[in-house]
């Protein structure tokens, strides 16, 4: 059975919890999983810290932040493994329109390593074969086989030369206006594009609103006395270039203990300015014997999160620093202003 990108019914969104509720819940869950050894009245401490989150880590009075129930734009698309052709069979059918093997391999590797495991990816047969070879399950692939197919129902579309020729101006103008990663150049270029389920006008409006919210949130983090920011990282916060999941996680983490932001990273090659930075290097402000235990507590806090705040990966890189990275694509509307 083949799937041709039929739009699936929209899922009803749950009511959006307030920012104080989000912070309080985050901290409550973490302290429930990590009780303070040798201290009585732990429950009282949880309540006190969660309440302090509203004043100490909220991203500023007058700016109300809310979590949007981020659901995938489509249900997972099922297809038996046999529905995805082998790389050898696909090569002949795509011919000169196919991207070079090296570019296709680089794009497949990035998607396998950076894209959320829940994301459905639309692709031409050759690209789908490369993605399957890199470990993506067939249930995550929407194969664009015919001229009647469209990428709606997926979260991302891999725009090879074949896909660009198939959809023409509709690819950017109707289905997928934003490039979140790009590989190669010229006719063989491969772009990874985010699908706009509600249309390109609504998507572009959401991107603009999201940047405004990220600027506001980042500015408030810069004013947070429990967060130290390296000079090179300050601009990313003030210009709205940081992923909202990082912004919210850092605000919650700062309530638990002071934190230093050493820098933000961009693991998305060729991404446009609309794509925020999804990774950060963090350090503890505690020194001496307390430094490493403090860092491990930070890592435990990060790893205890639930979606959409559970990162793609997080690890210690030394006794004084850790890295955290979120998956692509980042959610829009995770921060909302008044």
Question: Which residues fall in each region the model found?
Answer:
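Secretory targeting and sorting signals
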Residues: 45-69
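C-terminal region of N-terminal signal peptides and the immediate post-cleavage residues
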Residues: 60-88
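Glycine-rich phosphate-binding "P-loop"
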Residues: 79-103
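Loop/turn elements at helix/coil->beta-strand transitions in domains of secreted/extracellular proteins
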Residues: 115-120, 152-154
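Short, polar loop motifs at secondary-structure junctions
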Residues: 124-129, 161-165
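Extracytoplasmic
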Residues: 125-154
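Aromatic/acidic, Gly/Pro-rich catalytic loop(s) in extracytoplasmic/lumenal soluble domains
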Residues: 154-338
């Amino acid at each position: 059975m083949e799937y041709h990108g039929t739009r699936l019914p929209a899922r009803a969104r749950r009511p959006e919890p307030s920012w104080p509720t989000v912070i309080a819940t985050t901290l409550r869950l973490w302290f429930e999983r990590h009780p303070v050894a040798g201290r009585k009245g732990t429950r009282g401490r949880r309540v006190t810290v969660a309440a302090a989150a509203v004043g100490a880590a909220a991203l500023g009075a007058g700016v109300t932040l809310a979590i949007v129930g981020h659901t995938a734009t489509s249900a997972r698309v099922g297809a038996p493994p046999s529905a995805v052709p082998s790389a050898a069979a696909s090569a002949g059918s795509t011919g000169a329109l196919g991207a070079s093997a090296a570019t296709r391999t680089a794009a497949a590797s990035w998607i396998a390593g950076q894209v959320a495991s829940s994301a459905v990816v639309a692709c031409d047969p050759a690209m789908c074969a490369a993605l399957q070879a890199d470990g993506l399950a067939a249930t995550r692939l929407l194969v664009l086989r015919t001229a009647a197919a469209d990428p709606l129902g997926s979260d991302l579309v891999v725009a090879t030369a074949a896909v660009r020729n198939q959809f023409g101006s509709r690819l950017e103008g109707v289905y997928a206006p934003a490039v979140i990663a790009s590989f190669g150049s010229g006719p063989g270029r491969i772009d990874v594009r985010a699908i706009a389920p509600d249309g390109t006008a609504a998507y572009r409006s959401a991107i603009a609103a999201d940047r405004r919210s990220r600027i506001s949130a980042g500015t408030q983090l810069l004013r947070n006395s429990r967060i130290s920011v390296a000079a090179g990282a300050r601009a990313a916060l003030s210009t709205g270039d940081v992923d909202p999941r990082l912004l919210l996680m850092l605000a919650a983490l700062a309530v638990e203990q002071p934190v230093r932001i050493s820098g933000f990273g961009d693991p998305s090659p060729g991404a446009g300015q609309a794509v925020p930075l999804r990774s950060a290097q963090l350090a503890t402000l505690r020194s001496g014997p307390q430094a490493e235990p403090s860092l491990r507590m930070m890592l435990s806090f990060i790893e205890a999160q639930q979606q959409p705040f559970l990162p793609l990966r997080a690890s210690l890189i030394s006794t004084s620093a850790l890295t955290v990275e979120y998956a692509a694509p980042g959610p829009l509307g995770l921060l909302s202003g008044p």
